[in-house]
Design a protein with these regions (language model features):
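Short, low-complexity N-terminal leaders and the immediately following helix N-cap/first helix
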Residues: 1-68, 319-343, 407-409
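Helix-rich terminal scaffold detector
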Residues: 1-7, 162-294, 298-304, 315, ...
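Short, glycine/charged-enriched hinge/interface segments at domain edges or termini
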Residues: 2, 7-8, 13, 58-219, ...
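Structural signal for hydrophobic packing residues in well-ordered secondary-structure cores
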Residues: 15-22, 39, 97, 139, ...
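Flexible glycine/proline-rich
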Residues: 24-29, 37-38, 135, 256-409
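Short beta-strand/loop turn elements enriched in aromatics
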Residues: 26-28, 43-68, 100-114, 316, ...
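Short, hydrophobic/aliphatic alpha-helical segments
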Residues: 32-45, 78-90, 136, 279-280, ...
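Short, conserved secondary-structure segments in the cores of folded domains
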Residues: 36, 48-49, 79, 87, ...
């Protein structure tokens, strides 16, 4: 193994290797969470007409006292005649105001009679929504790289779009190596364990916006590794292999990747857990495949995926690779490692001075249950002694609303 590189350098190499994927049109009903491939410029005004903000009566300029009610304007069924002095038109919220409308008076402020209405003095412009006051034609309503949230989908629909031009979602193959791995739901042989990495990593792929192309367990065999990895490289945009990347006699993943033409970018990161992480690229005629060799220990696999593969999957879609980060105050001291930065599983809570991070307890890389209580990974820089309580540290969020914040109003 070469000299381990810092986390920031490893991420830089990963992100600099990325070629954005091609774009496709996605119906709005299927576009939640997708990433825009281009700016969206509105061709329409929103709202498309001057309308009423209240149920009431549309009034001409200077109207007060007794007015003749000459008609009604309903949402979707506008009154088409212009307002004249001494008249009013009953109007519903959201309905277009007739030509000549100066204001709308709410229904609760008037006295109605037979065909007439008594109205108080009403200032011009009252309760009238102007055409284009939300969006003007030519406005950029969403930028390339925006992730489509429910409000964003609503905005697209409001400007008349039925689909969005989005970057294609990356296809991600997940392989787990080891003779001991057994599919969950089957009986364990002596010395075997149920394979947890494929399903855990698949969940991280989906959370990053990718599509799981396959999950597969592979025995500790050089030929089997070459075949499985070769098949994955042929069909996926990203290949993640857990296990087999260290220096043991049964670690065949690095050799298989190199034999298949994958160009190594780095092997070894100054990180705990996750030191043996491997990354490389394979260039084909019309595409580039990213290949990650992740440690086999379950926590190490999830941590290194979060730090390196997840930003890559986001960047392939044109999304901000570093969006899910924050700064927090350590609530208790953490011993530093002299040669490696540490990704410490932590629980986040909110306080007046910002987020606070408290380690979840034992940090062994095989203890997957330790991830259950974690909202984030606090990055503790290498050095002597300890990171004291009160120190501000960078935190990689693990997804969703941190549990310590979920009860906030």
């Amino acid at each position: 193994m070469s000299e381990p590189i810092p986390i920031a350098e490893a991420r830089r190499r990963v992100l600099e290797s990325i070629h954005p994927l091609d774009a496709e049109d996605v119906p709005l009903g299927e576009a939640l969470g997708r990433v825009l491939a281009e700016d969206v410029v509105s061709e329409a005004a929103v709202p498309p007409f001057d309308g009423s903000a209240m149920d009431g009566f549309a009034l001409p300029a200077g109207a007060e006292g007794s007015l003749e009610v000459v008609g009604e304007s309903r949402a979707g069924r506008p009154w088409t005649e212009p307002l004249e002095a001494g008249t009013a038109v009953r109007i519903s919220t959201g309905a277009a105001v007739p030509d000549g409308t100066a204001a709308v008076v709410p229904v609760e402020n008037v006295t109605e009679g037979q065909g007439v209405v008594e109205v108080p003095p009403t200032p011009d412009g009252a309760h009238v929504r102007l055409r284009g006051e939300d969006v003007q034609p030519g406005n950029v309503v969403l930028r390339r790289g925006a992730e489509l949230s429910p409000p964003a989908l609503g905005v697209l629909a409001s400007v008349g779009r039925s689909a969005a031009r989005c970057t294609r979602r990356p296809l991600v193959a997940i392989l787990a190596t080891g003779d001991e791995l057994t599919d969950p739901g089957t009986e364990l042989a002596p010395g075997a364990i149920w394979s947890s990495n494929p399903v855990a990593l698949a969940g991280q792929v989906v959370r990053a916006g990718g599509v799981v192309e396959r999950t597969q367990s592979v025995p500790d065999d050089a030929q089997a590794s070459r075949v499985a990895i070769g098949d994955a490289l042929a069909s996926a945009d990203v290949v993640c292999v857990s296990g087999g990347v260290s220096v043991g006699p049964h670690d065949h993943v690095k050799g298989a990747l190199r034999d298949l033409g994958v160009q190594e970018s780095f092997w070894g990161v100054a990180l705990r857990p996750g030191k043996p992480t491997w990354f490389g690229t394979l260039d084909g005629r019309d595409r580039r495949v990213l290949a990650f060799g992740l440690p086999g220990n379950p926590v190490s696999a999830m941590v290194t995926f979060r730090l390196f593969a997840m930003p890559a999957i986001r960047a392939l879609q044109g999304a901000d690779p570093g969006a899910a980060r924050a700064e927090a105050v350590l609530d208790e001291p953490v011993a530093r490692h002299p040669r490696r930065d540490q990704a410490v599983r932590c629980r986040l809570t909110a306080a007046a001075d910002g987020l606070h991070a408290r380690p979840t307890g034992r940090q062994e890389s095989h203890m997957l249950t330790s991830m259950l209580a974690a909202d984030g990974l606090a990055l503790i820089t290498l050095g002597e002694g300890e990171a004291p309580a009160g120190e501000r540290v960078d935190v990689e969020l693990l997804g969703g609303v941190p549990s310590g914040l979920s009860s906030r109003p």
